[in-house]
């Protein structure tokens, strides 16, 4: 026993990293449990593809989606964390916050999966992050308004809430058009009958184009689900690595000399803009806002928290830090931490400026390009992290698909799903998730698919199983509040019990 205790004491980083990877692995596997049904339920139901083949291909496409999907959504979720916690993420508080987020998300997702109820991993994750925001504000005596970026949260909330509504309307409209068009002109096609009826009647019409459409849209859902949901896991694992191994992961040590030069050029460009518009900026940015942005950078000797010209001090500090640097490996851990904080603060300042009405559209685009160049140093993920998340999501897709698939196939409506309904729901989901992934917008694949199916049933007058719909809506409504409470409770307990 003493051996294990001493091993834990001297190798705590290794132990924590193993636990963190295990938690994230479980989270992504459960995510695969839930969302695999979105892609394969209808192609299995319509017998467009063999069950085992559909599951295998869905898992592979989820993997590829994570690997080639980029990182915009990963960091959109990360930046919902409190700014003071994000800037000092490599602390024990940061690690406790991440564990609380993961554990609350795992518990809720596992419960809903066991009950065969489709819920959103994105909603769970965002609810958990908001819970951390509230506890962080309370224990530090901060105003919650100063810690939460409401513009970002409203933006994410709107995408999560409006996407199912759009799915319902678009899928319903598609069914209406297919029903009207094919019933009047092409009655010989069997698009408006169910696969069950097709088999009973022993119809001989070709289903080739229907099956091809269903298979391709299913592949699209699988790929873009990986691109959208997989990124959230990548963001979480990067936060864990920064907490446990700051010397290796605070910034991208493998950044090329070319990219470092681009960062220096971006800093110089922002300084020129700031000097040209310094008076106008000071008139519109309040002292309180300046203090909130500069507060984490009090390690700089020339910072005066009572003045409004500290932005130039930060710019000069970053310029001096990057002077004659050809590789970030030349910086020590403290310098890496200071560079990360400085880049985040300048990025936040650009975000603040871009929301002012006085800023022209061309200047907003200028800020967007500058911010992208500056944050490329810290918005990254090693290939092994992406591979780990991709494998986790794929494994979840392959082993846990049956429960939620059964809900989609049999429990939403009182009548069998027609080919037209299946095509409409899958095309709507595939297009919505692909558009969101390419735009860097986090959405819930589960919610879009569920609402699309409900929309087709309403238009087709298939009849809905009210109990299942009621349970699903209740789960949707409760997901964010419950995950908030769970994460808040776990974070509070961890802060009080494990100092």
Curated annotation (Swiss-Prot):
It is a multi-pass membrane protein. The keyword Magnesium does not apply. GO terms for molecular function: phosphate transmembrane transporter activity; symporter activity. It catalyses: phosphate(in) + H(+)(in) = phosphate(out) + H(+)(out). Keywords: Cell membrane, Membrane, Phosphate transport, Symport, Transmembrane, Transmembrane helix, Transport. InterPro entries: Phos_transporter. GO terms for cellular component: plasma membrane. The chain crosses the membrane at residues 4-26, 56-78, 98-117, 124-146, 156-178, 207-224, 234-253, 342-359, 379-401, 473-495. Low-affinity inorganic phosphate transporter. PANTHER family: LOW-AFFINITY INORGANIC PHOSPHATE TRANSPORTER PITA-RELATED, PHOSPHATE TRANSPORTER. Belongs to the inorganic phosphate transporter (PiT) (TC 2.A.20) family. Pit subfamily. This is Low-affinity inorganic phosphate transporter.
